[in-house]
């Protein structure tokens, strides 16, 4: 179950409402980098968490914190929409050009939500849960979580740089700080599991004899006009300690040409596809 406080996790203040910034803040709510995504991702990972119960507890706790971030962002959107034009006449009175674009705001903030936040991104597209990653493998999920927090922090810093509002900058600095913690929090879980080397390859429970190990540790170049760039990925021991990284400058073609043969009768193909015989050409 969940408990709720009437107070926000952190103060949210807007010194000068900005409907355009309200539209941009929607990305932090309903975008693929946003808080709905991470809240639901951590929640469903927790629902399928097996093994160390501490990890499930951590996931649930962080999912709940992300819900608190949605609450704060929703309040920030509403505050930025204060005083937004509600009619053709009101918009035109402010600026004749604003009539066409409503000051850059999302018109659905008027038409659909009455000047409040929605579960959509900055383009007004609803969040559809297609970017929720909960694999049941804790190592894979933690790496996905680091990526989610990293892209979320990138978004928050871009929003911070976009606005000149001191209240919004203060609020966003808090979200940036929490993303800093959450990135490292999920990496710390991997460390608790023995570190990245012990976790790789994911899943580390698959028997090595089931893998074509001769193909496991070379970095493959597919460029026709450039050699493979050299780096840690092309030399030295693999992170799992099971092999050595090498470079292969061109693919070794071990397969044959993929020919499917003739089409099946009744499949809707042309007669020539079924028979494999080209039609006679008229003389």
Please annotate each region the language model reported.
Residues 1-283:
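Non-heme di-metal
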């Amino acid at each position: 179950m969940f408990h709720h406080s009437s107070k926000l996790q952190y103060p949210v203040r807007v010194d000068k409402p900005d409907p355009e910034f309200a539209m941009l803040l929607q990305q932090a709510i309903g975008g693929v980098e946003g808080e709905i995504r991470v809240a639901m991702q951590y929640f469903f990972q927790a629902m399928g968490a097996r093994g160390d119960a501490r990890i499930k507890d951590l996931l649930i706790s962080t999912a709940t914190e992300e819900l608190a971030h949605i609450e704060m962002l929703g309040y920030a959107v509403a505050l930025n929409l204060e005083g937004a034009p509600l009619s053709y006449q009101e918009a035109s009175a402010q600026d004749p050009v604003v009539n066409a674009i409503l000051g850059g705001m999302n018109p659905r903030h008027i038409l659909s939500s009455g000047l409040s936040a929605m579960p959509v991104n900055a383009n007004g597209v609803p969040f559809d849960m297609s970017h929720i990653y909960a694999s049941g493998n804790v190592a894979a999920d933690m790496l996905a979580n680091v990526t989610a927090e990293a892209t979320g922090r990138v978004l928050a810093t871009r929003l911070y740089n976009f606005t000149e509002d001191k209240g919004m900058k203060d609020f966003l600095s808090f979200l940036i700080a929490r993303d800093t913690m959450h990135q490292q929090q999920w990496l710390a879980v991997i460390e608790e599991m023995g570190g990245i080397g012990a976790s790789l390859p994911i899943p580390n429970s698959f028997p090595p004899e089931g893998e074509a190990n001769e193909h496991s540790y070379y970095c493959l170049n597919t460029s026709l006009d450039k050699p493979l760039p050299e780096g840690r990925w092309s030399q030295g021991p693999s992170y799992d300690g099971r092999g050595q990284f090498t470079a292969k400058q061109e693919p070794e073609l071990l397969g044959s040409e993929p020919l499917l043969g003739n089409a099946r009768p009744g499949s809707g193909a042309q007669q020539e596809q079924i028979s494999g015989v080209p039609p006679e050409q008229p003389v």
